[in-house]
Amino acid sequence: VVLLMASLAVLTACGQQSHSGKAGSNQSVQSKAKDKSVTKSYQLNQKVQGLDQTMTLTVTYAGKKYEKVNIAISQNLPEEAKSALAGQDLSSLQEEVSKSFKQSSGVDKLEQVKGIQVNVKVTEKGTVDIDFIIDPTNLDYDAASKVPTYGPIFNQMKSQTPEEFIKSFQDEGGKEISNPS
């Protein structure tokens, strides 16, 4: 399990850093009452240290105001981690594996920030699925931006409009997809 957690920590950190992008200079401005809520989703398939990773960004916004942001990462486990878990009952290990992963990857520090919820699950298919559910209306941007590895994403959200944030994801290769249910 320690090997698995170390592998996951490195892989997730690399995946998060690849999305840090370039922060824009525009500050978020309160949206007009006429602005309608829009939800857009984008997906980026990439290799991180030779392993397949899918990152899905879903942003709900009205004008220049974020309403909800979800970043979902599905990462293939390294073969040695898959072997270590083979034949084990993942449902009984889920809590322990999730807790260890969160600690080793720094995700546990994000969970302490107001406005962020993180869910981690290791699947039977040999992937780790991480969901970052962000409530921008309650997010402590300053605290989030200080979390190692993940801070640049929150600096980017703070300094960019939702459309600029989405554009930076597209610039990295993100393609629009239908919104997840």
Description of each model-found segment:
Residues 20-34:
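N-terminal low-complexity, Pro/Thr-rich disordered segments
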Residues 1-2:
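Bacterial N-terminal signal peptides that target proteins for export
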